[in-house]
Amino acid sequence: MIQFHIEAPDKGLEAALQDKIDNLTKPKGSLGTLEALALQVGLIQQTLSPVLRHPVNVIYASDHGIADEGVSKSPKEVTRQVIHNFLNGGAGVCYLARQHGFELKIVDGGVDFDFPVIPQLIDRKVRKGGTRNFLHEAAMTVEEMEKALQYGADIVTDCYNEGCNVISFGEMGIGNTAASSMWMTCLTQIPLIDCVGAGSGLDSEGVRHKYNVLKRSLENYKGDGSALDVMRYFGGYEMVMAVGGMLRAAELKMIILVDGFIMTNCVLVASRLYPEMQSYCVFGHCGDEAGHKRVLDFLGAKALLDLGLRLGEGSGSVCAYPILDSAVRMINEMHSFKQAAITKYF
């Protein structure tokens, strides 16, 4: 299987970074989370003057066999319809990407549709038709999981080679909140009932049905419970690609902007495999999907925004980017007390 070499950022520069932040013209700590972000980014980049370059939002897309059990309000064909909307620039994340200067990369990891050759669509289809139905069998084979991890990592390598040092991950795949709930309950031991939500808009009866399907799936699972086995048995190709992408981004010392419930569960899996990767993560928002706050708490993560979002696509992480930008501008553009000839007042 693909291996990554991920080290936590060297903290040798921490004192100098903190001193620079503390000596900007403000009361110590008065810019709160911006100061913590500036310190984190400075450590990731190992510099007193960090920069953000060429932000990219990568959207991995695939269909899920479990969707055949009616665990989503939307039918499978919505996945490919939304892909077309991405390509036409009309989706929610598209206007946010335009607003905040992100390049969008759309990756077909296993959508149940034969797209024609489209220059803007990156074809990395692991299996035609998407994953298998994990109510009855593993969603993917070991070989397919390894291929998805590699494909996800390769996309990030391309972004890095194009000058990107801050990357957001989004997803599209009907049924992927169900898959994420399975990852969450298996790897956190949080009861399944607390991991299952409305997804794309199920009513209470729909959520109950979704829970019952997932409960049966959990009862049928006979694996070893390891992160790799749980990822393979219940995951979507787009989710496994995101895990591979996140791990490669951490290996390359890029800043990882984490989106919603699904991407946070991808961090859960990735950090179980390589705990140091979480040092590179900035959690964009706490969404409205049941379980999101619980998995953030499990990871010890504090999200930047709480706007009731549950769209996915990377929309929440792209929304949070200006806060990260403000933190970097703070450490680079604010004057020190000495520069401003102001008496240090703390």
From Swiss-Prot:
Please tell me the species this chain comes from.
Parabacteroides distasonis (strain ATCC 8503 / DSM 20701 / CIP 104284 / JCM 5825 / NCTC 11152)
Q: Name the residues annotated as catalytic in the UniProt entry.
A: 313 (proton acceptor)
Pfam families named among the record's database cross-references: DBI_PRT
The EC number(s) this enzyme carries: 2.4.2.21
Q: Which residues form a coiled coil?
A: none
Gene (name only): cobT
Keyword annotations = Cobalamin biosynthesis, Glycosyltransferase, Transferase
Q: What protein am I looking at? A: Nicotinate-nucleotide--dimethylbenzimidazole phosphoribosyltransferase
What exactly does this protein do?
Catalyzes the synthesis of alpha-ribazole-5'-phosphate from nicotinate mononucleotide (NAMN) and 5,6-dimethylbenzimidazole (DMB).
Could you cite one Gene Ontology molecular function of this protein?
Answer: nicotinate-nucleotide-dimethylbenzimidazole phosphoribosyltransferase activity
